[in-house]
Amino acid sequence: MDQHKGDASLGGIVKALGLVFGDIGTSPIYTLTVIFTLTQPTRENVFGILSLVFWTMTILVTMEYAWLAMSLGRKGQGGEIVLREIIMKLVKTGRLVAFAGFLSFVGVSLLLGDGVITPAISILSAVEGLLLIPGLEGLSTGTLVAIAAAIAIGLFSVQFKGTDRVAGAFGPIMAVWFSTLAVTGVVSALSMPEIVEAINPWHAFTFFRENGLAGYFVLSEVILCSTGGEALYADMGHLGRRPIVKSWYFVFMALYLNYLGQGVFAITHPEAKNLLFGMVRDQMPTLYIPFLILTIMATIIASQSIISGVFSIVYQGITTRLLPLMRVDYTSREIKSQIYLGAVNWSLMVAVILVMLLFRKSENLAAAYGMAVTGSMTITGIMMIIVFAHTTKKWRALVALVITLIDAAYLLSTFSKIPHGAYWSLILASIPFVTIIIWTRGQRSLYHALKPLDLETFLISYEQIYAKGPIRGTGLFFTRDTDVVPPYVVHCIIRSNIIYERNVFISLVITDEPLGVETELIKGIGPGLDAFRIEAGYMEVVDIEALLKANGIQEKVIFYGVEDISTRNPLWRVFSVFKKLTPNFVQFHKLPASRLQGVVTRVEM
């Protein structure tokens, strides 16, 4: 399994801070504050919670993602779709492949649903820091929500311009943010040096023993310290493994030092409503406003990384045929992976603002937050067990099993959040999940309903018609495979006698590798008939027109099929609506409109 190590220099590490760690890096704004609204901040409880935070970040982020998951890259790429492709290549059993496919569908859906709640809670929690500024204590909840919504609208409104111009500043800003977290945490912790003893897992066991079942359900809030940990693996393709892992060591230290400082502040100021903001204002009141500005910038960067991550996941889903085609715009001439999906962007913005309006406070959002990410972690763990069980490193499957059981324990604890709004995570995740199921099954059913003709049978009639005299020029026909002929091609050539001097069947095959483009021109499969096969990785941006020119194919007209679906099945009706509302293949690949000719085929499903 190929691993791209990446740039582990200081520049690469700083860049990773801005691109990967925004989500987990803003967790200190709300994590302990939420926990200690539910749990009394006694000395024993604080030590127990801080112990749980340390071991949660160690096991679920460092071990699960930085160590295990990031060893399973493919050409440097990571994520649950990558794990699915690895399993499909390793495993031959149909049921296990189907199970892995289903898990990846659920995992991707949970991550997309999480992409709504994360920007909402990050921005809202930062804006709530305004309440600690003298003179602004009386700001209403509605005003705070309006400010947070305005920031979100501004962020989503500039996505179409791309982020490459300002992305260079993300890393340095986040470096300042993490350094500030570390320094403020140390300053607070110095007043109670024994707080470092919280690392001892015995404090966590004592907390469970003293609090019983209530202590177990606190895990549903403790997990907030690790939300965003999955980004280490998902974003591996952008930077490589080494800079992300090295950055994580610094981020881990900065985060935990801040949590220790907040723990001390919670013990000495049990009445505090927001631990991070209260601690910083107590330490340096004159610098509180600059810190608040830095906090808002950090949450904007965190939200930007989530938005970019959602774009990337959806693009992977499109290219692997899990999701319908959507219009994709490329926001950078130099970096093809920087993309903008308008439909996703505006849908995400509406959902984020809706969530802000529904929950109104970050503590309310925190009550709904965590189920999706723990579900995703558990699914990643199960998929890693399958992968490692089919490799020579079978002992890692045992380690992955232990971690997955811990994931499952956290996931089970989050079920206590369902009455408090966690069902919104499930509702949000169900939208992409249902879309994936309908789209994948619909495509399969449509392909069978079309009843393509095998090439040998097609060639018998084709050769007879070609002998009568073809039209001058070159005609291109898109097919799923060069060995079978779709009905629209049969209609064009056999029934309508539209045949050119040179006819080329073009097929685009998505491989199970993330990157790489290969082409093969097969000449003479019939008189005046060639086949052009493109094999591309599922993360590649394929310029079909450029590939045609590079292989000397100058088309006069490009034919493609348009299916007119007739059905009584309600699922296939939804599938038909998806087909009508989304771009078709040639529109997605931006082929020249003046040369396109759609051929309608009526299909009974």
Swiss-Prot record:
Keyword Methyltransferase among UniProt keywords: no
GO cellular component labels: plasma membrane
Catalytic activity: K(+)(in) + H(+)(in) = K(+)(out) + H(+)(out)
Pfam families found in the cross-reference section: K_trans, K_trans_C
A GO molecular function held by the record: symporter activity
Family affiliation: Belongs to the HAK/KUP transporter (TC 2.A.72) family.
Protein name according to UniProt: Probable potassium transport system protein Kup 1
Organism, scientific name: Geobacter metallireducens (strain ATCC 53774 / DSM 7210 / GS-15)
Taxonomic placement: Bacteria, Pseudomonadati, Thermodesulfobacteriota, Desulfuromonadia, Geobacterales
